[in-house]
A protein has these predicted regions:
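Short helix-to-coil transition segments within interhelical loops
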Residues: 9, 261, 270-279, 351, ...
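C-terminal membrane-exit region of the final transmembrane helix in multipass inner-membrane proteins
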Residues: 325-360
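Transmembrane alpha-helical interface segments in multi-pass membrane proteins
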Residues: 245, 258, 266-312, 328, ...
Length: 360
């Protein structure tokens, strides 16, 4: 009788495979979605922190990164005032336009290179008109080269340069072009401030805040941590995805085990007439469910690893498969299997042996 779960699994191979596949898809959904969100936030944090400037000043009410408004709302006149503050080495305006998960940066190349390590490694800088520079990751994922065009603002931009290292958005156009395209000349999205003495950056940030009390200041060294803690909307989204995955996986297991118990009604009646306890029968049903679920979880993790390499091979997106979340997915998968088998296990355990033996 100890082999009952395994014998049932191998007796109904197709149903076992389909159930495990359902669990696997649920696990892969959770792992890849969480990995995509965490990878996106991690990538954004480090690309924003790659700027050599120590302080980032945003418009009133604006957060950081993708919480920035897509409208250029901060006057570039603030740059002259910032440069006049003792301790400020330089201040550079950057326009940012967000579309989907992509960002187009508007920069003045000569000014931006003073506050970052960005350098053109192929072609030349985008200095005016409908010209664009892209980074190596975007170039590789889209198989682009110098002279190709990309669509931005509903018109083609000619790629004139490839830059390294990755910083901010993956596409950079002249700031004036971005301002004119958005009908916001004289405005920007954020200002990066280079500090003369990095050891005094906190004190300088305090003095800047006094002169610009309505603006939001962020230290670029803290951006990876800010992104790592996530954006509230993303965290809510992840909770919904995890919850739906557990529910769907539980329903898949419940349906399978309910069918199994119904098919084996006579066998259960025989076992009970031979003295099998209710706890033992319920335990056998749970064992079978957990074995099927475990196979599904392992398959789901394998799908997740393969999916990560496929996504990163063909897109500029990054997926972070953190060990803690892999263990979390394992626990969620087994939990969903256990919950899904509760009702079938209780139904099997509570069957009347006489009625079960007469079941056709």
């Amino acid at each position: 009788m100890d082999s009952l779960p395994l014998s049932n699994i191998f007796h109904r191979k197709t149903r076992t495979v389909m159930t495990s596949a359902g669990v696997a898809l649920g696990v892969a959904l959770v792992v890849l979605t969480v990995g995509l969100v965490h990878g996106f936030l991690y990538d954004q944090g480090h690309r924003n922190a790659a700027v050599a400037a120590e302080i980032m000043m945003n418009p009133p009410g604006a957060g950081f990164g993708f919480q920035l408004s897509t409208n250029l709302s901060m006057p570039t006149d603030a740059i002259d005032k910032l440069r006049s503050i003792p301790g400020v080495s330089d201040a550079v305006a950057v326009g940012r336009y967000t579309h989907g998960l992509g960002v187009v940066d508007g920069i003045d190349y000569d000014s931006f290179t003073k506050v970052s390590a960005l350098r053109v490694v192929e072609g030349r800088a985008a200095l005016g008109g409908d010209e664009a520079m892209i980074d190596r990751v975007l170039q590789a994922s889209r198989k682009l080269k110098i002279g190709n065009t990309i669509q931005e603002f509903d018109r083609p931009f000619k790629i004139v340069g490839i830059y390294e290292p990755e910083s901010l958005g993956r596409i950079k156009v002249p700031l004036g072009t971005l301002q004119n395209s958005m009908n916001r000349p004289g405005f920007c999205s954020t200002i990066f401030i280079k500090v003369a003495d990095p050891s005094q950056q906190d004190e300088l940030a305090r003095r800047i805040q006094e002169q610009f009390p309505k603006n939001n200041l962020f230290m670029t060294r803290e951006l990876p941590v800010l992104y790592a803690t996530g954006i509230p909307a993303f965290n809510t989204f992840l909770k919904v995805v995890v919850g739906l995955s557990v529910i769907v996986s539980s329903l898949v297991v419940l349906l399978t085990m309910y069918t199994t118990v119904t098919e084996r009604t006579r066998q259960i009646g025989i076992l009970k007439s031979l003295g099998a306890s209710r706890q033992w029968i319920a335990g056998e049903v749970e064992k079978e469910a957990l074995l099927i679920t475990l196979a599904g979880v392992i398959a789901g993790l394998a799908i997740s690893v393969a999916g990560k390499y496929a996504v990163q091979r063909f897109t500029p997106l990054s997926i972070e498969l953190e060990p803690s979340w892999l263990l979390y997915a394992l626990g969620l998968g087994l939990l969903s299997g256990s919950l899904g088998a509760l009702y079938p296990a209780a139904r099997a355990a509570n069957q009347d042996p006489i009625a079960a033996l007469s079941y056709e």
